Amino acid sequence: MKKFTLLISILLLGSTFAQVYENTNVPCKPISEMASHYSALAKASQRADIFDYDVHYYNIELDINIDTEIIYGNVEVHLLPEVDNLESIQLDFASGMTVDAVTVNGANFNHFYDLLSITLDGSYNVGESLVVGIQYHGHPLQGGFQAFAFGHQGNNPSRPPMISTLSEPYGARSWWPCKDVPTDKADSVRISLTTDAAFDAVSNGMLVSETLNSDDTKTTIWEHKYPITTYLVSLAITDYTYWTEMHHFADGDSMPLEYWMYPSSATAPMVERWNRTAGMIDIFSDYFGKYPFAEEKYGMAQFQWGGAMEHQ
């Protein structure tokens, strides 16, 4: 709980400026509407079969077409059965998305009512690992706080496109098939993002590579090696001003602090505000313990909203 408080506090303090300087049209919904939406999703996520298997790793590959607002995905789910004679699994995945194929250890599938039911290619017992691959495409529908959103910087259509996710608490299923419950954290995740070469694609963990493709797109790969729940898997894609610095902890360890800000926001006063993050990390570390993801990075990216969403 202490580490969780630390992470929220740093992000909220670091991103407050956006409420005043960028966003005049922050998305809002009636509390009753959001409560009803989340209640329905929570009930759907309490089905008994979610305990039949344990997810260890997600490999998420997305090709995002900004002009058509269509994403093309390929997700591999690496899992271990928790029961013997496992012959099928269910994943959470929005019905509005189209499943093109299920591969590897998957055979047949049905996709309805936001559930992707997959018949495996055999019967698996406790301790036997398997991989299910899902190829899909579609336009993700927003839900809850946001889930997956195509928009623009500052919510202004005359400014550069802005793509981002805010999947708390059950919104990950709107844009990638997964076991969308906070009780099952994957040990690690790999996220590959292909989109317009002019834009930066930001996600969890450490940058592995950036590759310019022959069709004027760029593929950016991130890897996050801490246990993570699905709603914390995130992305932010737009034209960013980027800078970084190394932060040194009292115990001698160090990690990069990485910042992605809209160019129109990157004035000297705003940059100075974000650069206060290093001091905040020191203060919170003294009170609550060392930053919990010190082996990777602390990253902060501006998006359409005026507040902040803690990821990891």
Q: What do the PLM-derived regions correspond to, one by one?
A:
Residues 4-14:
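Sec-dependent N-terminal signal peptides
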Residues 19-72, 156-160:
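N-terminal, polar/Ser/Thr-rich
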Residues 20-23, 94-155:
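A surface-exposed beta-strand-loop module
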Residues 60-63, 77, 106-108, 119-124, ...:
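Beta-strand-rich interaction surfaces with strong enrichment in secreted/lumenal proteins
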Residues 69-82:
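Short beta-strand elements of extracellular/lumenal beta-sandwich folds
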Residues 73, 165-168, 179-312:
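Hydrophobic helix-coil surface modules that form long, contiguous segments used
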Residues 84-107, 194, 198-199:
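Solvent-exposed beta-hairpin/edge-strand motifs
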Residues 126, 136-190, 243-246:
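Glycine/proline-rich low-complexity spacer/linker segments in large multi-domain proteins
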